[in-house]
Amino acid sequence: MAFQSWAQGLIDDHTWMTIKSIKGVRGSRIEKGRALQRKEMAKLVFHCEEEKTLIGIRDAAIFMLGAGCGFRRAEIVNLCLDGVDKVNRSVRVIGKGNKERLVLCSDTVWDYLSKWLFYREKVLELGIPNVFCVIYKGQHIDTSRPLTESAVYAMLKNRAAESEVQTFTPHDLRRTFATRLFENGNDANIVRENMGHSSILTTQRYDKRDKERALRATRDIHVI
């Protein structure tokens, strides 16, 4: 509007330059997402194990790949059996931009993934190559139907409610992975490589350490 007024001769050059020099009001918003606490992860996984069902074993493995390897929801559902290297205990996925990356599993992550693979590999014949499949009635693995992204979202939501854990998104598991890497003293470039990011600025947004410390700090204030 100001430019049009200046162009039409309704305001003089001095007024126009004054208006141009005024900077817009800057603001910020609280970033979305969070990193799950270790006790929350323990509750979720324990709840899965306590069921003593194939669904529980499968879901525990999904939790571990999300928080222990930083896999996106799409990467989890599209993970294929030939992407799992049992010798090196590594998992290979195709991420955003058709970029392939290899992630080494920790002992804990591998233990949970192996438990699921033990049952999954018993039903390889005439099936899809996906690691994670639909399970009927708790015990029947349907190798013709891969797990979907929406099914993973619903599973996490239900598990959180059943375990009395604060609601979180599938991507929060990925944020948890990045935050744990930072907590272990890894530099941002190492975290970026493991996350499959192109930009280190993107990786830094996944670091939730300062946010959690800031929130906890206010709880320690004694007003009176």
Residue ranges and their predicted role:
Residues 1-224:
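Conserved catalytic core of the tyrosine transesterase superfamily
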